[in-house]
Structure formats: C-alpha cells, structure tokens
Amino acid sequence: MIYGILAGNKLHLSEIARSLKEEVTLKKTMDRLSRNLNAFQEKQPLMQNYLTLVKQHIKDDYAVIVIDNSDIAKPASRKLEALSEIRDESTGEITQGYLTIEAAVLSESGKMPLPVYEKVFSAAENGFVSETHENLCCLKSLSENFSRKCIRTLDRGFDANDYYRYFLKRSERFVIRAKKNRNVNT
C-alpha cells in the first residue's frame, strides 16, 4: 500500500492499485487493497505516533487549534452507503451527502496547519447520536492529546451552550465566533 502511494503519488485506491502494476486485474488488486485496509487494526497506535510527531512542531502553551465543521455534498449519488440530507454550505441547498469535523493545529512558525482530527459522519449511520455528539468527541480527543493552554478556535456553528460548558469545565482556552443573536453582557 505504501509503495503504491509513493509510486503513484496519489491517494485514490484505483491509482494506488494501478501504480503497483500487478499481473492480476485492476479490480482484483483494488479489492485486495480495500479488504486489507478494512482489516487494519492499528489505527490508534498509528494516530498516537502521528500526534507525537505533530507535538514536536508546536508550542503547547500558545498553539492554536482550528476546529471546523464542513460537508461533502453528493447530490447525484444514490448508491453510497449512509447518505443523509445535509445543507450544502457552498450553495445553501438541502442535498444528499455527509458531514465532517476537522481539527488542525498551527505549527510553531504558524505557516503550516497540521491535521490532528478528522471524521466523516452521517445521520443515516447506525449508532449516530447527533452532530453535537460528534463535535464533542473531537473536542475530547483534543483535550486528551493537547494542553489546556492551546487556544481552540471555532466558528459560529459552535456558538452553543454545550461547547461553552465543555471548555469552561475543563478550563481550556477557546475563541468562538459568536452568532449575531448572541447576547453578551459586558
């Protein structure tokens, strides 16, 4: 798999399979790679090793972590699993697709965002609770892996009491872009 990624310089499974130039059909190579990826059980140790490397490039006492929700619109797709109705942020229309939560920490120089959390989810998945639950899972992962002193920055989608309570309970530093209807007492 790693050889295929390096040789093909792409992350699409079909391109990785093509770059391997195996004697079997492309479909069989893709099926094997897909099956092996699905059976991969070392995600947690791999992620911890990656986060250890990331931490070498940040200053814990003032690092900025950017947390953002987004969507993947798939309006023409009918066969993808767990498609649900989403609001396409680029058009404002309701369509089929997936939601995402992503977090990146800025490197010490501030020039490079280093991804530290990423999840694609759908309301149609088994076990789905809510978008707030998925967001809190992201925040918990960040709390486990980064200092309270890191500044979490979030857009107005996070302007809800659940998130304020979360950060205040843990004494974590945060900046949330407020919605227009947020009342602030000074």
What are these regions (language model features)?
Residues 8-18:
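Short, charged amphipathic recognition helices of the HTH superfamily
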Residues 60-62, 98, 111-113, 147-149, ...:
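A general structural motif
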Residues 19-32:
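Short, basic interhelical loop/turn and adjoining N-cap
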Residues 119-186:
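An internal, acidic/charged active-site-proximal segment
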Residues 15, 25, 79-82:
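Noncatalytic, typically N-terminal accessory segments of nucleic acid-processing enzymes
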Residues 75-81, 114-117, 163-165, 186:
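Short, conserved acidic/polar surface loops in the N-terminal third of protein domains
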Residues 2, 30-109:
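Active-site-proximal, Lys/Arg-enriched surface segment
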Residues 16, 63-73, 103, 150-160, ...:
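Short, conserved catalytic/metal-binding motifs centered on acidic residues
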